[in-house]
Design a protein with these regions (language model features):
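Charged C-terminal helix
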Residues: 156-184
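Short pre-catalytic strand/loop immediately N-terminal to key active-site residues, enriched for Gly-Thr
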Residues: 111-124
Length: 184
């Protein structure tokens, strides 16, 4: 990943400040080390709030544990409630990645998406999901719907790739190559 150095934190702050200055309410998808930076520095959340952007966070369980200051076990016991509560508290759209992904919006909407397979639990798969959501969010005005569509298409791509290659042999590039096919 990009890392969590002071330089990276300054870069994220600069991006968020530019959003604030622009006055445009653009969707922003945050994943991986951006989430780790948010977990470590509450002031970054204030910038996301000031930006007015539709912030979409895409953590896996361990990243969400750091963001929400809870344990993975606590999340497993109460995923729906914690996801919804977090989305409301942080005014973000939360995409909680797992075998069944939960998408929660600050307005209380929740979508449960049991699509995909364990072959998708590979480095780079989350990057494909982030890009998929970002691409859809750039075209839709409803960022919650964009996140749900992105998760669904990503999962369908994974299912198609698994049928062709098997779960154990899947790579992120297989997900990308099947995205166009699931859109037809």
């Amino acid at each position: 990943g990009i890392g969590t150095s002071e330089e990276t934190k300054l870069f994220l702050q600069a991006v968020l400040r530019e959003l604030v200055k622009s006055g445009k309410q653009l969707p922003v998808v945050l994943d991986a080390d951006a989430l780790n930076l948010l977990a470590a520095d509450e002031s970054l959340w204030k910038l996301t709030a000031e930006s007015g952007a539709a912030v979409i966070c895409t953590p896996h369980m361990a990243e969400f544990a750091r963001l929400a200051h809870v344990t993975v076990e606590q999340i497993r016991e109460n995923r729906l409630q914690l996801a919804g509560q977090f989305a409301q508290e942080k005014n973000c759209i939360l995409v909680l990645k797992d075998a069944t992904t939960i998408v929660a919006a600050p307005d209380g909407r929740i979508c449960i998406l049991p699509v995909g397979n364990d072959g998708m639990a590979v480095a780079g798969s989350g990057d494909v999901l982030t890009g998929t959501i970002a691409g859809i969010a750039a075209r839709l005005t409803d960022s919650f719907l964009a996140a749900c569509c992105g998760v669904y298409l990503h999962g369908l791509s994974g299912e198609k790739a698994a049928r062709k290659k098997g779960n154990a042999a899947m790579l992120p590039t297989d997900l990308i190559s099947h995205l166009g096919k699931v859109l037809k």
